[in-house]
Structures are given as structure tokens and as C-alpha cells.
């Protein structure tokens, strides 16, 4: 357990926008799961199935919503969105210790770079020429920063992140290990012999403020226009964003999803795991695409969209597939019957 700072319940309530139920002077130094929490720690309950622990936990306080507050026999912080409060508590009680500024002696830095003295450049990092890195930004071991790239302040690029040339990253963004930003888009054209000819990809990747990109995600550079990731976008591990895509502010994309080239996704959208979006389409603001959804055309109205089939036993699924194959013949038979009735 990592012990952070100590706060009273009243101080925590003020910080996260909650109401104190019980002793506001109770001291808290850590956040823990409700089944394992000990005195001096605060836990949280967001799911009704865990409410049995309210009378069993050793925690000094619980973070919960108004509906569960009356069932809590110990000190509590009460708010309408305990999950949001939990995130804020972790930031307060488990502050990350960042390394001091400086460039590791094994790092390679090209000519004409502007690296703020407070930035931390880890071991074996390669920074090509004309790169700009802002204050308090951390570049992890083995990362590669391409020529002419610009990274804002308070960013964290974990070990072995790769930025191709001319990439732009705003402030307070996080990129996890193995992510590749700015690789060539999948631009090809067949010649008269039927052979594939590569189309040079000369655009950039532009990433806004407060963006998080998961491990081994890939975002390709644009062909001519830039690939743009808006402010506050959160991209999970193993997501693929193709060339010329534009992702609107505060959209989230879950793991293994893919967005094909030149597609625009609006603001405040949610794209489920393993979803696939066709190229050259537009998704309006406030759209939710459920897991494994296959989106082949533009969506113009906010709402929830699904296209996958629910789980069945193998036996049931095989029957469903056979019936699906029979739909065309059934439709023809239905038309013939309609003609007879008329």
C-alpha cells in the first residue's frame, strides 16, 4: 500500500463536492476496496451487490450515493456520482511522484530542439531535430520523438512510445507504452498492371489537450489533411485510427475498435470495444455505439446504435445461422403467397 497525504473527511468533501455524514474530523490517508479496507482508509460503493459490506468493512468511511447513505452505519461521503468522487479521491490520496527535470545521459537529442528544463527525458530516448517539449513533460525510457514534433506541458509519454515527424500534442496528455502516433496511412492505388502503388502520406497527427491514448494504439498521419484528435478524447489499448480521421472533443473509444480513413466522429460519443467504423462517413455528436457494432453509413441523430448479435449456445447459434441463410428464399415464398391471396 502506498501511503499518501492525510485529509479530514470535511476537507475531502469540499475537494470532491460531497456531503459529510458522520464525523467530519475523521482522518483519511488512503483509498481501498471495501472488502480489504482498514482503519484510516476510505472505500466506495457504487453497485448494490456490494452493500452487504457496509456493515462488515473496517474502513473509516465510505463514499456512496444518496440511496445507500441511509444504510451506512459508519462515516460517509455522500454524492450523486460516487465514481467521479472516487477518481478525485485517488488523485488526492495517491498523488503520483514525478521524476525531476533533466535529460538522461544515454538520451540522444538532435539539433535545434527546445526542451524545457523542467521536462524529464528518460534513458535511451531518441529525439530528432527541431522538437519542442514543454514544461514538466515526461518522456519515458526508449521513446522516439520524430523530427519537428511538438509536445505541450504536463504530458506523459510512457516508455517506448513512438511519435513520427511533425506530430503535435497539446497539454496534459498521456500516451501509454507501445503507442505509435503518425505512421503512414494505408493509402494505396492500383496501376495498370494491377500492382499496388503507395500514396505518400504527407499530413500530420494533431492531438489536443487532456487526451489519453492506450498501450499499442495506432493513429496514422493524414494523406494531405491532418488526422485530428480533439480535446479530452480517451482512446483505449489496441485501437486503430486511420488517416484523415477526426475525433471530436471528449469522445471515448474502447479497446480493439477501429475507425477507417476520412471518417469524422462527433463530440461526446462513446464507441464500444471491437466496434468498426467504415471510411468516409460522419457520426454526429452524442452517439453511443455498442461493442462490436459495425457502422457502415453515417449517423445523423444522437442515440444508441448496435449491430452485433447477442450470445447464444453454439447449438442455438447454428440454428440461427441456418435461418438467416433461408431468409431470401422465405421472402420469395412470401411474395408468391401474397400474389395468390390478391
From Swiss-Prot:
| Superkingdom classification of source | Bacteria
Give the matching Pfam families: Hexapep (PF00132), Hexapep_2 (PF14602), LpxD (PF04613)
Name used for this protein in its record? UDP-3-O-acylglucosamine N-acyltransferase
The answer, when asked if Transmembrane helix is one of the entry's keywords, is no
Which gene codes for it? lpxD
Its biological purpose is as follows: Catalyzes the N-acylation of UDP-3-O-acylglucosamine using 3-hydroxyacyl-ACP as the acyl donor. Is involved in the biosynthesis of lipid A, a phosphorylated glycolipid that anchors the lipopolysaccharide to the outer membrane of the cell.
Which reaction(s) does its UniProt entry say it catalyses?
a UDP-3-O-[(3R)-3-hydroxyacyl]-alpha-D-glucosamine + a (3R)-hydroxyacyl-[ACP] = a UDP-2-N,3-O-bis[(3R)-3-hydroxyacyl]-alpha-D-glucosamine + holo-[ACP] + H(+)
Entry's EC annotation: 2.3.1.191
A GO molecular function annotation here is: N-acyltransferase activity
Spell out the family assignment given in the record's similarity comment: Belongs to the transferase hexapeptide repeat family. LpxD subfamily.
Amino acid at each position: 500500500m502506498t501511503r499518501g497525504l492525510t485529509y479530514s473527511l470535511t476537507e475531502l468533501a469540499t475537494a470532491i463536492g460531497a456531503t459529510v455524514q458522520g464525523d467530519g474530523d475523521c482522518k483519511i490517508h488512503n483509498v481501498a476496496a471495501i472488502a480489504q479496507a482498514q482503519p484510516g482508509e476510505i472505500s466506495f460503493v457504487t453497485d448494490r451487490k456490494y452493500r452487504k459490506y457496509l456493515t462488515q468493512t473496517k474502513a473509516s468511511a465510505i463514499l456512496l450515493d444518496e440511496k445507500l447513505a441511509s444504510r451506512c452505519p459508519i462515516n460517509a461521503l455522500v454524492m450523486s456520482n460516487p465514481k467521479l468522487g472516487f477518481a478525485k479521491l485517488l488523485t488526492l490520496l495517491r498523488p503520483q511522484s514525478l521524476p525531476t527535470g533533466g535529460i538522461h545521459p544515454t538520451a540522444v537529442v538532435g539539433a535545434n530542439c527546445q526542451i524545457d528544463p523542467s521536462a524529464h527525458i528518460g534513458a535511451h530516448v531518441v529525439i530528432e531535430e527541431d522538437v519542442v517539449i514543454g514544461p514538466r513533460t515526461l518522456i519515458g525510457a526508449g521513446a522516439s520523438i520524430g523530427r519537428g514534433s511538438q509536445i505541450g506541458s504536463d504530458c506523459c509519454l510512457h516508455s517506448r512510445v513512438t511519435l513520427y515527424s511533425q506530430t503535435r500534442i497539446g497539454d496534459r496528455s498521456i500516451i501509454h507504452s507501445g503507442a505509435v502516433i503518425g505512421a503512414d496511412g494505408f493509402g494505396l492505388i492500383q496501376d495498370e498492371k494491377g500492382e499496388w502503388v503507395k500514396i505518400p502520406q504527407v499530413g500530420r497527427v494533431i492531438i489536443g489537450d487532456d487526451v489519453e491514448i492506450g498501450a499499442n494504439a495506432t493513429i496514422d498521419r493524414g494523406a494531405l489533411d491532418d488526422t485530428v484528435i480533439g480535446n479530452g478524447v480517451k482512446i483505449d489499448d489496441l485501437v486503430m485510427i486511420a488517416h484523415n480521421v477526426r475525433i471530436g472533443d471528449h469522445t471515448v473509444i474502447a479497446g480493439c475498435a477501429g475507425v477507417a480513413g476520412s471518417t469524422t466522429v462527433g463530440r461526446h460519443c462513446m464507441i464500444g470495444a471491437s466496434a468498426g467504423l467504415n471510411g468516409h462517413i460522419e457520426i454526429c455528436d452524442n452517439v453511443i455505439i455498442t461493442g462490436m457494432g459495425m457502422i457502415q453509413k453515417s449517423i445523423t441523430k444522437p442515440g444508441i446504435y448496435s449491430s452485433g448479435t447477442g450470445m447464444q449456445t453454439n447449438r442455438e447459434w447454428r440454428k440461427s445461422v441456418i435461418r438467416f441463410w433461408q431468409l431470401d428464399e422465405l421472402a420469395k415464398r412470401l411474395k408468391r403467397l401474397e400474389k395468390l391471396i390478391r
